[in-house]
């Protein structure tokens, strides 16, 4: 799964997820893309689950790109522990997602195949998404 090799601090504050995303909101590599339409956090496990769902459906044809990286640590306290007594231990890594962010890109496959692959991938993600296509102008 995806995770940073080295970080300055083990724990981070959650922060606010407001506003839209300007950087990373256009297709850079492929012909088709999956774009987020709401804010949220996507964990490394969810990114990998969506990637596997896509690649299995297209039978490893064409090429896919993952445009997000989980660089924010999230923590969790153990089960049945009372509140307080400090912040929990680091549990995993997540990517902060704002509306407009391109999550995945795909090329070298037909339109219908890409659309269905992204639909299967979207079921694995906690944010609402839409299918986008490169404008040939």
Swiss-Prot record:
InterPro entries: Ribosomal_uL16, Ribosomal_uL16_bact-type, Ribosomal_uL16_CS, Ribosomal_uL16_dom, Ribosomal_uL16_sf
Region (Disordered): 1-20
Superkingdom, taxonomy of origin: Bacteria
Gene Ontology cellular component list: cytosolic large ribosomal subunit
UniProt keyword tRNA-binding present: yes
Pfam families the UniProt entry points to: Ribosomal_L16
Biased composition (Basic residues): 1-19
CDD domains: Ribosomal_L16_L10e (cd01433)
Any single GO BP term: translation
Residues spanning the signal sequence: none
Keywords: Ribonucleoprotein, Ribosomal protein, RNA-binding, rRNA-binding, tRNA-binding
An example molecular function term from Gene Ontology annotations: structural constituent of ribosome
Family to which this protein belongs: Belongs to the universal ribosomal protein uL16 family.
Function: Binds 23S rRNA and is also seen to make contacts with the A and possibly P site tRNAs.
Subunit structure, interactors included: Part of the 50S ribosomal subunit.
Classification via HAMAP family: Ribosomal_uL16
Name of this chain's protein: Large ribosomal subunit protein uL16
Primary gene name: rplP
């Amino acid at each position: 799964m995806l995770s940073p090799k080295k970080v300055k601090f083990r724990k981070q504050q959650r922060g606010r997820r407001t506003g839209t995303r300007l950087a990373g909101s256009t297709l850079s590599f492929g012909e088709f893309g999956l774009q987020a339409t709401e804010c949220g956090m996507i964990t490394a496990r969810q990114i990998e689950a969506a990637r596997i769902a896509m690649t299995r459906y297209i039978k490893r044809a064409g090429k896919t790109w993952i445009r997000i990286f989980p660089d924010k640590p999230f923590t969790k306290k153990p089960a049945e522990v009372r509140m307080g007594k400090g912040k929990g231990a680091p549990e995993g890594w997540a990517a902060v997602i704002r509306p407009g962010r391109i999550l995945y890109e795909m090329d070298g496959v037909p339109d219908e195949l890409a659309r269905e692959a992204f639909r299967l991938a979207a079921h694995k993600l906690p944010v609402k998404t839409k299918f986008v296509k490169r404008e040939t102008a």
